[in-house]
Amino acid sequence: MLGDDLINGEESNTYSYMAVLQKLLTDNGYNLTVINKTLQGGGTLSMMKMAGVSDETLQGYIAKHQQTANGAQLNVTETGIRDLTDEQTTRNDMDCVPVIFMGYYGGWNHDPAELAEQQEQILNTFPDKSRFIVVGTRPMDSSVSSDTLDQVLSQKWGEHYISLANVTAQPSATYEAQQAMAEAVLQKLQELNYISKG
C-alpha cells in the first residue's frame, strides 16, 4: 500500500483501508501481509520521495508547479517534501503487488495527467511493473472532479484502476469509504489473479 492514509492517528490502525484489507485477507483465508507505506496528510511529492524517485525528478515537478502558479501562493504539498525517516524510505515492499492510492492531499498541480505520471514514477521503482492496482479519489480541495480524474486515470491504467467514486458515495475519509475501498481492492486482487490461498 503506497500513498495516502486518510484516517489520522491511532484510529488508522483499525479503520484505514490498509487495516480493513488485512482483516479481509485473513478472514478469507489468505496468508498475506499488507505492508503499509502510507503517509498521513502527505502530498504526492513526499510519496515519490519515500518510494525512491530521484531528487532531480522531484525538483522538476516543483519547478513546474512554481512556474504554473506564476507567483500565486501554492499549497505546501505542491512544493514541499517531508523529512522522511530511514524506516520510511527503506523499501521492504519490493516483492509486493503495489496498491497506489495517492493525490488526496495534492502535489500534482491539479492535473490528473501529472498524477498519472507520478503514479508511474512510483510503479517504476518496483521490479515487476505488470502487477499493480491504482485507486483514485478526488482531491480534498475538490479542485478536480471525480469524473475528470477517473476519465484520465482509467484510460491510463485500464483494468488496474479502481475509482473510489464508483465504489462508494461516502466521502473518502470516512470509515465507510475505507471499508468499501478495502473490499474493492480485495476484489480486484482476486479478479486479476494476483493472490492465492497457498
Where in the sequence are the language-model features?
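Surface-exposed patches in mature extracellular/periplasmic domains of secreted proteins
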Residues: N31-K37, V135-G136, I195-G198
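Sec-exported extracytoplasmic/periplasmic mature domains
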Residues: Q22, T26-Y30, G103-Y104, N124-R131, ...
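Conserved SGNH/GDSL esterase-like catalytic core that processes O-acyl groups on lipids
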Residues: L6-A113
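Histidine-centered active-site loop/cap adjacent to the catalytic His
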Residues: L24-L25, G158-H160, V167-G198
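Active-site-proximal beta-strand/loop segments in catalytic clefts of secreted hydrolases
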Residues: L2-D5, N36-G42, I100-G106, V135-M140, ...
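Substrate-gating cap/lid alpha-helix
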Residues: Q119-Q179
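Amphipathic, non-transmembrane alpha-helical secondary structure
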Residues: R82-T89, P112-E120, N124, Q179, ...
